[in-house]
């Protein structure tokens, strides 16, 4: 079905005007971003195809421009628009979080990262950087890929922590299997991070492993 065959009230732009932005599905939001379809496919068809490729919306923030272009109907112009929209959303989210969020317990931190990490198909190592009042001052994904001691080097983590004048950090990574039970490599990485933190004077408050709607705090479990 092409856009001109869609009921006027059901077109994304008209739907937004009539019912508000909250009434739009994720695919319809993507359709608004990419704006046009092709000669043979509507913009909504292409938007739905994008959402089928990225099973969870959080995956889009880690996709490269080449990955978006693998979707039939998406060229460099449309891929660039999607990436710009995703990046804008990330920056708005970070500014909001940094002004408002204080981490008092592992659950507070998990609420920040669970939506992003729980449904990814690759392991992502993510850090939250805090000030002396345990307020979030910055957060960033540091590594992508299998977590092991040769990849996750404390130097990279604490270089950024020092640059942000952090008093402490919390580290997270996801298990794509959904099971947050720690591996021997997870424990080795945690030990090295805690030791490096003691040397530079920046405390590793916790290393939390994210599974499917569940997590394990290595600090609470007494692993370090």
Swiss-Prot record:
InterPro entries on file: MPN, RadC_JAB, RuvA_2-like, UPF0758, UPF0758_CS, UPF0758_N
Domain of life of the source: Bacteria
Gene3D superfamilies assigned to the protein according to its UniProt record, in alphabetical order: 5' to 3' exonuclease, C-terminal subdomain, Cytidine Deaminase, domain 2
Entry annotated with the keyword Chloroplast: no
Keyword Hydrolase recorded: yes
PROSITE patterns: MPN, UPF0758
Domain MPN per the UniProt entry, residue ranges: 102-224
Binding, Zn(2+): 173, 175, 186
GO molecular function, a single term: metallopeptidase activity
Keywords, comma-separated and alphabetical: Hydrolase, Metal-binding, Metalloprotease, Protease, Zinc
UniProt short sequence motif JAMM motif, positions renumbered to this chain: 173-186
Pfam families: RadC, UPF0758_N
Transmembrane domains' residue ranges: none
A biological process from GO: proteolysis
Family: Belongs to the UPF0758 family.
Protein name in the entry: UPF0758 protein lin1584
């Amino acid at each position: 079905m092409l856009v001109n065959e869609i009921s006027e009230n059901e077109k994304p732009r008209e739907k937004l005007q009539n019912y508000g932005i909250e009434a739009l599905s994720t695919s319809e939001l993507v359709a608004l971003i990419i704006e046009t379809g092709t000669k043979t496919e509507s913009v909504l068809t292409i938007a739905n195809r994008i959402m089928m490729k990225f099973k969870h919306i959080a995956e889009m923030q880690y996709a490269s421009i080449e990955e978006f272009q693998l979707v039939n109907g998406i060229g460099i112009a449309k891929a660039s628009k999607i990436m710009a929209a995703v990046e804008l959303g990330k920056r708005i989210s970070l500014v909001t979080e940094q002004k408002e969020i204080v981490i008092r317990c592992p659950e507070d931190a998990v609420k920040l990262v669970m939506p992003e990490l729980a449904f990814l198909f690759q392991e992502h190592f993510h850090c939250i950087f805090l000030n002396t009042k345990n307020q979030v001052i910055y957060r960033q994904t540091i590594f992508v890929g299998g977590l092991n001691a040769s990849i996750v080097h404390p130097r990279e983590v604490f270089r950024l922590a020092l640059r942000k004048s952090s008093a402490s950090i919390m580290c997270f990574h996801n298990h794509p299997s959904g099971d947050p039970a720690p591996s021997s490599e997870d424990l080795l990485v945690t030990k090295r991070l805690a030791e490096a933190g003691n040397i530079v004077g920046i405390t590793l408050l916790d290393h939390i492993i994210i599974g499917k709607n569940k997590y394990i705090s290595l600090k609470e479990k007494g692993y370090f």
